[in-house]
Curated annotation (Swiss-Prot):
Chief location of this protein within or outside the cell: cytoplasm
Subunit text: Monomer.
Summary of the function given for this chain in its UniProt record: Hydrolyzes ribosome-free peptidyl-tRNAs (with 1 or more amino acids incorporated), which drop off the ribosome during protein synthesis, or as a result of ribosome stalling. Catalyzes the release of premature peptidyl moieties from peptidyl-tRNA molecules trapped in stalled 50S ribosomal subunits, and thus maintains levels of free tRNAs and 50S ribosomes.
EC number: 3.1.1.29
GO BP annotations, alphabetical order: protein quality control for misfolded or incompletely synthesized proteins; rescue of stalled ribosome
GO MF assignments: peptidyl-tRNA hydrolase activity; tRNA binding
GO cellular component assignments: cytoplasm
SUPFAM superfamilies, sorted: Peptidyl-tRNA hydrolase-like
Organism this protein belongs to: Tropheryma whipplei (strain Twist) (Whipple's bacillus)
Protein name listed in UniProt: Peptidyl-tRNA hydrolase
Alphabetized Pfam families for the sequence: Pept_tRNA_hydro
Length: 186
């Protein structure tokens, strides 16, 4: 039986796979251990890890809310953890947040429009654009080689944090992050 839904935000298609905006789905790829996600009739790809259902919405970021909401309804699950990029956090930073605003993140706005704002988020810091690059171009671009090293380690830690849902729920995720030395702090 599914107890938690963990949704990794991102855009569909191989051209977006390595972009900053897709770090939420990158975390799910680590958690899957190479297993293939299956398509669900609610326009999601999913993989079950026992009581945790990993979900990749098969929709663009700003349309992810309806597909996540329909899967939650289908499985009668009320506990949601959303994994997403955050430009307001330095590269390599992780933060857990329960509820609150969207900070202009269109994926979160779509989810909040469908479900309200009382869901958990694991924010993955991607930093801010430099040299007057637009935010849209920045989040849809790939990481540099140095940034890739940092974000790869961060994504691995985010995946470990998600596994703490099994034993300790959202408190376990929050405690793991608080006790973990993150790559950006080295």
């Amino acid at each position: 039986m599914c107890v938690y839904i963990v949704a990794g935000l991102g855009n569909p298609g191989p051209s977006y796979d390595k972009t900053r905006h897709n770090v939420g789905q990158m975390v799910l790829d680590i958690l899957s251990g190479g297993a293939r996600f299956r398509r669900h009739k609610t326009n999601n790809f999913y993989l079950s890890l026992g009581d945790i259902l990993l979900v990749k919405p098969d929709a663009y970021m700003n349309l992810s809310g309806p597909v996540i909401a329909s899967l939650m309804k289908f499985h009668s699950v009320s506990d949601l953890l959303v994994l997403h990029d955050d430009i307001d956090l330095p590269l390599g930073t992780l933060r857990f947040k329960q509820g609150g605003g969207t900070a202009g993140h269109r994926g979160l706005r779509s989810i909040s429009d469908c479900l309200g704002s009382d869901y958990a988020r694991l924010r993955v810091g991607i930093g801010r654009p430099e040299n007057n690059q637009s935010i849209e171009d920045f989040v849809l671009s790939n990481f540099s080689p140095v940034q890739t090293d940092i974000i790869s380690r961060t994504i691995q830690l985010a995946a470990e944090a998600v596994l703490h849902l099994r034993d300790n729920g959202f408190v376990g995720v929050k405690q793991f992050i608080a006790q973990t030395k993150l790559p950006s702090r080295t």
